[in-house]
Amino acid sequence: MNYKMMGRLIAQILLAEAAFMVPALIISLAGQDSQAILGFALSILVILAVAGMLMFFARRAKKGFYAREGMVCVGLAWIVMSLLGCLPFWISREIPSYLDGLFEIVSGFTTTGASILSNVEGLSNGMLYWRSFSHWVGGMGVLVFLLAVVPVSGRNDGFTMHLLRAESPGPNVAKLVPRIRSTAGILYILYIVLTVVDFLFLLAGKMPVLEAVCTAFGTAGTGGFGVKNDSMASYSPYIQNVCTVFMLLFGVNFSCYYLLIMKQVKSVYKDEELRLYVGMVLGSVLLIVINLRGFYGTFEETVRHAFFQVASIVTTTGFATTDFDLWPGFSKAILLCLMVVGACAGSTGGGFKCGRLLLVFKSLRRNIQKMLRPQRIQAVRSNKQVVSEKVLENTNAYLAAYVLIIMFSLLVISIDGFSVGTNFSAVLACFNNIGPGLELVGPTCNFSVYSSLAKIVLIFDMLAGRLEIFPILILLSRDTWRR
């Protein structure tokens, strides 16, 4: 295990985290929020000190770096980044409990959007910015940012691929161009452009600048931290519709946008995962609109809320324009199903992913056909390409781990004594990086009702869900740390 190289990478991530806090510090200085200024200033100093110690430890690091190190490095980096990223909340006392602050920042970095805050509007502007910016950083991945922007000594394509595979969502990682660093750069350019366009559309709707920035960050990262207690409910229909469109856009595999730029429209049109994603959204909206007849005053309002909530849940953003916990049971069941499926692989969205769902169904169909015709050899194909047995094996392992973690988490947090509906939706909301659940953790409530043990379990769920389970589970394996 190349501990020194991992230490150097984590140090560089912490340096980036300290730099990310500077705009929040400037906003706090402009607002003369003394506690927030103290929180960010001390946090930056602590992070720089830890980064300095890691850099000292990592001097003369060897360049060898393999898949195991990649997984371990990603898992450790996200944990350390979260443990230090919550310091501004705690030092400023805007969130007095360190565990609550950790829950909040993990929810931010993992783009979950689950909160322990009853009064979001009570936070200072700097804290609101930092809270939302954590979504934007976590959406595409801090290590993808590192690979795209920060020069790392001794880096090569094998090295970067191990990191990209460990942090990127989906059953497989595809190169857009031959060099991995260029792929990471293209992803971030697309991400930045879409975020800026979203921000400009929000400004056009007369949304205040800071609110537009925070909302754009939350939409781009499909995170869902709002700056108002009622999330998006008090904004105009125009702003709600803008958010709906951009949530759906950020739920699409970013390679589709690259193919469109390369004028490969036919490839995008024939993409099976994209077709499933679009069909799922349209079908869900249609069924919910039918189920909500007479629930709202006008048909336009019904369609707007249905489209917004479907987009918010399927992309795992978690914004809300209405209390969907009051919807009929059938509509809530649709939303629960969308929580599980999630967005496309290669997007900023969470969940099981449409791509994985397709592979599971195709693998199931092949197994049934094998039972009927044992002598027949049939490959599983995705977009007319044969899917390797290794990818199918990893997908099945992911499904097994996915179900087991949900079962374990549900059992542990049920100790608190809340209803099965509250606990099950809380686990789904955190593990799939969605945010709001149902009942006591619905869109008008928060997660402060849970005990410290339950919050720790949900923090684990958020990290495991964002990092696609294995980088976190590998940290818990004894074999990982053996020579």
Spans of features found by a protein language model:
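Membrane-proximal intracellular helices of multi-pass ion channels
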Residues: M1-R483
